[in-house]
């Protein structure tokens, strides 16, 4: 993506629509205003009603033009937005007219926001916040994205970076003014104190049980239990549709089937899994393996007991897990365990209560961390690596392995934290982040 190009794209929803917004950014904006707008380029931040023509003089539409001059724009470049009628023919003509001008091309996904990042208008976490707010479906997702877009994460990571930079300066003093090769205790003490403080804060951030990522991507709930206990029917009841195949044949479900719901104001992925049992069937055995993995990775497990089959109680039930006693409408062969929820997928008994229990769990989990520092897997990966480097730096100082080694470890940690917000070269990360944006953003 060459910065000298001028880019354009439809920034509003797909046609037909009442209004279409064509966004343009780059050095050719002034030429576009002069060539295509009947009234010329408007004054900065002033909307102008004008006729828009193509380079052959054919009328495209009558619309509103809004100009923002560099660096006072979203991208930091000269930008022009055209508000046109939202018919497909108008939009197609406008984009063809723009790209007919030398140096103007259609934008790639996320290219406007990438230019904003490259021009210092946003850092990488703020750019991710832009993508997240576009995709937000729940109030919790929107609030988290707005906080990130507003620099909430930047402030925290910049604080750590500033503290580490000061720590590195103290280590450099130790290197430049050694005391006969030993680390002076009065110099090492404040360095160790700084390192311990930052490490403690990072450990706290990493101990959030993935709340920020779950708010963004969705909480995971796995329905587990023996074959024919009614797991698929429970999924269908919760989904209010036939999401999973239901038969009387044990072992019908052989893969993980997921549905996406919004419960308790949070996105929740509920997975129906294969019945847990020993089997010689290769395909079913793979399904059981996947079921166990889904259960292990889930935030919450729904353990299903078949009330007509006195099978052993579920294994590995954690405190927050839910036990449901299915087929409560039939004559139970066993008594429901204490704390189990009696349900019937036939009559619907207990389904609403099960749904409310799931909603209560995800609501509690989402509110357990007031302001998550980690909202994506890449943030967690960098923090884990940064913490490892800081631990190595502390150990080097404590064991007298040398200030040089400690300094190098602190530099590594600083680089890891800086890469989260894009303060260092992260070209591979940029491609992954901005490729997920929509065209026009």
Swiss-Prot record:
Q: Which PANTHER family match?
A: TRNA MODIFICATION GTPASE GTPBP3 (PTHR42714), TRNA MODIFICATION GTPASE GTPBP3, MITOCHONDRIAL (PTHR42714:SF2)
Q: Which UniProt keywords apply?
A: Cytoplasm, GTP-binding, Hydrolase, Magnesium, Metal-binding, Nucleotide-binding, Potassium, tRNA processing
Instruction: List, alphabetically, the Pfam families matched.
Output: MMR_HSR1, MnmE_helical, TrmE_N
Q: Tell me the Gene3D superfamilies matching this sequence.
A: P-loop containing nucleotide triphosphate hydrolases, Probable tRNA modification gtpase trme, domain 1, tRNA modification GTPase MnmE domain 2
Q: What does this protein do?
A: Exhibits a very high intrinsic GTPase hydrolysis rate. Involved in the addition of a carboxymethylaminomethyl (cmnm) group at the wobble position (U34) of certain tRNAs, forming tRNA-cmnm(5)s(2)U34.
Q: Which domain of life is it from?
A: Bacteria
| Protein family membership | Belongs to the TRAFAC class TrmE-Era-EngA-EngB-Septin-like GTPase superfamily. TrmE GTPase family.
Main localization of the protein described in the UniProt heading: cytoplasm
Instruction: List positions binding GTP.
Output: 228-233, 247-253, 272-275, 326-329
Q: Where does K(+) bind?
A: 228, 247, 249, 252
The protein's location, in the record's own words, is: Cytoplasm
The organism named in the record is Hyphomonas neptunium (strain ATCC 15444)
Q: Which cofactors does the annotated protein need, by name?
A: K(+)
Ranges of residues in domain TrmE-type G: 218-363
Q: What GO molecular function annotation could you give as one example from this UniProt entry?
A: metal ion binding
**Enzyme's top EC category:** hydrolase
Question: Which residues take part in binding Mg(2+)?
Answer: 232, 253
Provide the protein name.
Answer: tRNA modification GTPase MnmE
Q: State any GO CC term.
A: cytoplasm
- Cofactor descriptive note: Binds 1 potassium ion per subunit.
């Amino acid at each position: 993506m060459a910065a000298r190009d001028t880019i354009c794209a439809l920034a509003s929803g797909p046609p037909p629509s009442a209004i279409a917004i064509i966004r343009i950014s780059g050095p050719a904006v002034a030429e576009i205003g002069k060539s295509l707008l009947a009234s010329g380029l408007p004054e900065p931040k002033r909307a102008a009603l004008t006729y828009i023509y193509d380079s052959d003089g054919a009328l495209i539409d009558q619309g509103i033009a809004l100009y923002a001059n560099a660096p006072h724009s979203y991208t930091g470049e000269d930008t022009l937005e055209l508000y046109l009628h939202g018919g497909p023919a108008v939009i197609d003509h406008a984009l063809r007219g723009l790209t007919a001008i030398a140096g103007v091309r259609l934008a790639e996904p996320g290219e406007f926001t990438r230019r904003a990042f490259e021009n210092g208008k946003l850092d990488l976490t703020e750019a991710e916040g832009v993508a997240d707010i576009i995709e937000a479906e729940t109030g919790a997702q929107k609030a988290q994205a707005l906080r990130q877009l507003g620099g909430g994460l930047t402030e925290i990571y910049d604080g750590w970076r500033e503290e580490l930079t000061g720590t590195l300066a103290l280590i450099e003093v130790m290197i430049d003014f050694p005391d006969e090769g030993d680390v002076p205790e009065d110099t090492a003490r404040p360095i160790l104190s700084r390192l311990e403080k930052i490490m403690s804060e990072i450990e706290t951030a990493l101990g959030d049980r993935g709340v920020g990522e779950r708010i963004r991507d969705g909480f995971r709930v796995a329905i587990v239990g023996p074959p024919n206990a009614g797991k698929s029917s429970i999924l269908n009841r919760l989904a209010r549709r036939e999401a999973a195949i239901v038969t009387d044949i044990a072992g019908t479900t052989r893969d993980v089937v997921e549905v996406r719901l919004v419960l308790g104001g949070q996105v929740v992925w509920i997975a129906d899994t294969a019945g847990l049992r020993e089997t010689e069937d290769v395909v079913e055995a793979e399904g059981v393996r996947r079921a166990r993995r889904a259960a292990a990775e889930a935030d919450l497990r729904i353990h299903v007991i078949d009330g007509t089959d006195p099978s052993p109680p579920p294994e590995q039930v954690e405190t927050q897990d839910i036990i449901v006693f299915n087929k409560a409408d039939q004559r139970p062969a066993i008594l429901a365990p204490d704390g189990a929820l009696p349900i019937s997928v036939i009559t619907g008994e207990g389904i609403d209560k099960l749904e409310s229990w799931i909603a209560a769990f995800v609501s509690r989990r989402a509110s357990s961390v007031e302001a998550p520092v980690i909202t994506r897997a890449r943030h967690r990966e960098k923090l884990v690596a940064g913490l490892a480097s800081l631990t190595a730096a502390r150990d080097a100082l404590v064991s007298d392995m040398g200030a040089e080694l400690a300094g190098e470890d602190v530099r590594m940690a600083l680089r890891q934290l800086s890469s989260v917000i894009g303060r260092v070269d992260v070209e591979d990360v940029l491609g992954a982040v901005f490729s997920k944006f929509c065209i026009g953003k």
